[in-house]
Amino acid sequence: MAKKSLKVKQTRIPKFAVRAYTRCQRCGRARAVLSHFGVCRLCFRELAYAGAIPGVKKASW
């Protein structure tokens, strides 16, 4: 889990555009965020297994 201060810091608009970065909406993780879904890979996996993300299922071939 991310620190509360980092979550608050993310909500502010940065002075320079290159300083902006994505953060998981669910847990606050800054790395491995899937921008299409807005969550990190770990939360995405949990939500996909739970069936909370429509159209996503476990691949098997």
Curated annotation (Swiss-Prot):
Cofactor annotation remark: Binds 1 zinc ion per subunit.
Cofactor: Zn(2+)
GO process terms (BP): translation
GO annotations of cellular component type: cytoplasm; small ribosomal subunit
NCBIfam families, sorted: PRK08061.1
Family affiliation: Belongs to the universal ribosomal protein uS14 family. Zinc-binding uS14 subfamily.
Protein name, as recorded: Small ribosomal subunit protein uS14
